[in-house]
UniProtKB/Swiss-Prot annotation:
The family this protein is said to belong to: Belongs to the short-chain dehydrogenases/reductases (SDR) family.
E.C. code: 1.1.1.10
Keyword Hydrolase: no
PROSITE patterns: ADH_SHORT
Name recorded for this polypeptide: L-xylulose reductase
Keyword Aminoacyl-tRNA synthetase among record annotations: no
GO molecular function list: L-xylulose reductase (NADPH) activity; quinone binding
Source species of the chain: Aspergillus niger (strain ATCC 1015 / CBS 113.46 / FGSC A1144 / LSHB Ac4 / NCTC 3858a / NRRL 328 / USDA 3528.7)
Induction profile: Transcription is repressed by D-glucose and induced by D-xylose and L-arabinose.
Gene transcribed to yield this protein: lxrA
Record: active site: 161 (proton donor), 162 (proton donor), 175 (proton donor), 179 (lowers pka of active site tyr)
Chain sites annotated for binding NADP(+): 19, 68, 103, 175, 179, 207
Disruption phenotype: Reduces slightly growth rate on L-arabinose and abolishes L-xylulose reductase activity.
Listed GO biological process terms: fatty acid biosynthetic process; L-arabinose catabolic process to xylulose 5-phosphate; secondary metabolite biosynthetic process
Chain's role: L-xylulose reductase involved in the catabolism of L-arabinose through an oxidoreductive pathway. Catalyzes the NADPH-dependent reduction of L-xylulose.
């Protein structure tokens, strides 16, 4: 793969697993050095191992930084401080943050007056909005002064949104609202930061992972109509990615319980993000780029 991001530096929140981990692999393969943010002690070993692998494989610098974005102000300070410590140029004594990926997020469905979880309350609302909206806002604001000044608009900010921002899934009054807010901020930042960066969002749909396969048949049934209408979701036996990334049990569940329609692989989402981070994405800003196999068209 072309090292089109050689010498660049990116911050990825929620970079230890899932889509964030896949983005880390993609950017590292392009020569980009990384700061991977993670939240809990349970992710420390995993993130350190990931950084070691990426550093060795791709000859880049990758550091793990623990910071809990549910308390965003000190978390942002921790991330920026670590970036200054490890990525300040020894020749110019300045820090340049070329790429920011606002990927970290939380989601827990709850219906209005939910019979099992109780009504939506301020604590539930604030938990979602603090991590999914306030944290990326504060981190983007903090990174703004370190975005590259030359060439013009050469910085990249990518916000990881969701199809939930606009499709009205039941139980997602709050989560869907946070992703709609993130997309609104994307458009605002595209104008405010136009001189130094492009700003876009990417909106995945269902993604392969342990959590998706654990959601169960009720959720899969809710998604079936959407998946049936997703042009790229048909499970194709023998396809390289299918054979590499899905277990036989997962393939069985897709055939028998999901109508033969698979979720995305995380690296498919990461590929779209990676493109937006390169020079090939230079004329795209303020957009919500669909990375969901056609589940939702722009």
């Amino acid at each position: 793969m072309s090292r089109s991001l050689e010498g660049k530096f990116a911050i990825i929140t929620g970079g230890s697993r899932g889509i964030g981990e896949a983005i880390a692999h993609n950017l590292a393969s392009k020569g980009c050095s990384l700061l991977l943010n993670y939240t809990s002690d349970s992710s420390r070993t995993r993130t350190e191992s990931l950084c070691n692998t990426l550093s060795t494989t791709h000859k880049i610098t990758c550091i793990p930084v623990q910071a809990d974005l549910s308390d965003p102000a000190p978390a942002v300070n921790t991330i920026i401080s670590a970036a200054k410590t490890h990525f300040t140029s020894p020749t110019t004594n300045t820090l340049t943050i070329d790429i920011l990926i606002n990927n970290a997020g939380v989601s827990k469905d709850r219906f209005l007056n939910d019979p099992s979880s109780g009504p939506i309350d301020p604590a539930y609302f604030n938990w979602h909005y603090t991590i999914n909206v306030l944290a990326p806002l504060l981190l983007t604001q903090a990174c703004a002064e370190y975005l590259p000044r030359k060439p013009a608009h050469s910085g990249r900010i990518i916000n990881i949104s969701s199809i939930s921002s606009s499709l009205g899934f039941t139980g997602q009054s709050v989560y869907g609202g946070t992703k709609a807010a993130l997309e609104a901020m994307t458009r605002t930042w595209a104008r405010e930061l136009a001189d130094v960066a492009t700003v876009n969002a990417v909106n995945p749909g269902p993604v392969v992972g342990d959590m998706y396969f654990a959601t169960g048949e009720e959720f899969w049934k809710q998604m079936q109509g959407f998946q049936d209408n997703t042009p790229l979701s048909k499970l194709v036996d023998g396809e390289e990615a299918v054979e590499e990334l899905l277990s036989e049990e997962q393939k069985r569940l897709i055939r028998e319980k999901m109508g033969g329609r698979r979720p995305a692989f995380t690296r498919e989402i990461a590929g779209v993000v990676g493109m937006l981070c390169t020079e090939d994405g230079a004329w795209c800003t303020g957009s919500v780029v669909c990375a969901n196999g056609g589940l939702k068209f722009t």
